[in-house]
């Protein structure tokens, strides 16, 4: 109802699109996203939700046993305690199975064919963002490829970052050509300088650089 044409320039939309008040989108291609108020999106090659997704929730992470046993499952509010119960309490199989079932139920409840960008978020100079829910006041600048994930409030994802099947908690930072696959990044955790992680759970206030 308060849309103004000057909010858009050289934009291609496909599918189900919603745009909040005062949001500006320039030189970008977007499909199946609902974008909140006061966002700024500029020079994004492709931001799309191609199919139903749970945005990283319910993804199995083999953090303890690389052969796939003792799997922890990602969800937005994962804690070290819950991860410990899933991976280390195998003498209580019924309890572990119930926790995993609850996480999978939650993932299914949150699944959608439309992804979201929260209020006050900035996304600029980025290549591919696919099936990623982005919360409020996030900054995404110069990422290479994000897929099947959630980016928590106030977080930053920077230049040449790649991430697939991931969840970032609030105020986390991933920058400097770092790469994540099947990872949980806890609140205020910083990952930088080409750090690479696969099947890893980082809880609050970690700082990782130059390694894997």
Each model region followed by its residue ranges:
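Domain-scale signature associated with acetyltransferase and cell-envelope carbohydrate enzymes
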Residues: 1-212
